Every structure is written in structure tokens, then in C-alpha cells.
């Protein structure tokens, strides 16, 4: 239950949550802004890309305390698919024991 509560949100869910928290006037203001100056048009793709990357990595910051907490055993912090590379997968009884 704790893992479901602390599981990271997808960037799409975070965006929807932000739009839900904004008032309708703020949302329409975001959508109906005038076009920026031509010198800023070169900067705009980089800003959009950085915003998308921020939204992509934002869930990682929510899960970092959970992943790095020493109180949880390593089998709960890191699933077996993260601990074993595919070419060195453990035998089936060992894999069943780890879960």
C-alpha cells in the first residue's frame, strides 16, 4: 500500500494535475498568449525540451527517498530485474526466492 501511495506519477498525470489546480482564467491565459519576439523563437524549442525533460525526470525525485532508504531490505528497494542483467539472470528457484 505504501508503494502505491509513493509511486511516481507520470508526467502526463502531473500536467493534468497542474491544469486542474489552475483557475480557468490562468489556463486560457497560458493558451492565448501573444507570440514572442522573433529572437525568442530560437530559444523556445530549447525551453520546451527542458520543460519536457523536467516533467520526465520529476517522478524520479519522488521515488528517490524510497529507493535510498536503508530501512527497507534490498529486495524491496530494487526489484530483481534491476539487480540482475538479462544475460546473467539467476536460476529459477533463486528468482522465486527473491520475490
From Swiss-Prot:
Extent of motif SH3-binding: 4-11, 33-38, 70-77, 88-93
Location of this chain's protein in the cell: Host endoplasmic reticulum membrane; Host Golgi apparatus, Host cis-Golgi network membrane
Keywords, alphabetical: Evasion of host immunity by viral interleukin-like protein, Host endoplasmic reticulum, Host Golgi apparatus, Host membrane, Host-virus interaction, Inhibition of host adaptive immune response by virus, Inhibition of host MHC class I molecule presentation by virus, Membrane, SH3-binding, Transmembrane, Transmembrane helix, Ubl conjugation, Viral immunoevasion
Matching Pfam families: p12I
GO cellular component, one term: host cell endoplasmic reticulum membrane
GO terms of molecular function: SH3 domain binding
Biological process according to GO: symbiont-mediated suppression of host antigen processing and presentation of peptide antigen via MHC class I
Membrane-protein topology: Multi-pass membrane protein
Family label: Belongs to the HTLV-1 accessory protein p12I family.
Function noted in UniProt: p12I is a modulator of T-lymphocyte proliferation and immune function and may contribute to establish a persistent infection. Binds and down-modulates cell surface expression of interleukin-2 receptors IL2RB and IL2RG. Also down-modulates cell surface MHC-I molecules by binding to free immature MHC-I heavy chains in the ER and targeting them to the proteasome for degradation. Binding to IL2RB mediates recruitment of JAK1 and JAK3. As a result of this interaction, p12I increases DNA-binding and transcriptional activity of STAT5.
More about this protein: HTLV-1 lineages are divided in four clades, A (Cosmopolitan), B (Central African group), C (Melanesian group) and D (New Central African group).
Official protein name in the record: Accessory protein p12I
Organism: Human T-cell leukemia virus 1 (isolate Caribbea HS-35 subtype A) (HTLV-1)
Amino acid at each position: 500500500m505504501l508503494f502505491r501511495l509513493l509511486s511516481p506519477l507520470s508526467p502526463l498525470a502531473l500536467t493534468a494535475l497542474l491544469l486542474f489546480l489552475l483557475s480557468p482564467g490562468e489556463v486560457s491565459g497560458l493558451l492565448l498568449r501573444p507570440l514572442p519576439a522573433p529572437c525568442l523563437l530560437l530559444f523556445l524549442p530549447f525551453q520546451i525540451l527542458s520543460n519536457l525533460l523536467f516533467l520526465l525526470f520529476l517522478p524520479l525525485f519522488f521515488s528517490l527517498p524510497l529507493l535510498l532508504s536503508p530501512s527497507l531490505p534490498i529486495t524491496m528497494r530494487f526489484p530483481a530485474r534491476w539487480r540482475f542483467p538479462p544475460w546473467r539472470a539467476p536460476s529459477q528457484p533463486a528468482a522465486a526466492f527473491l520475490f
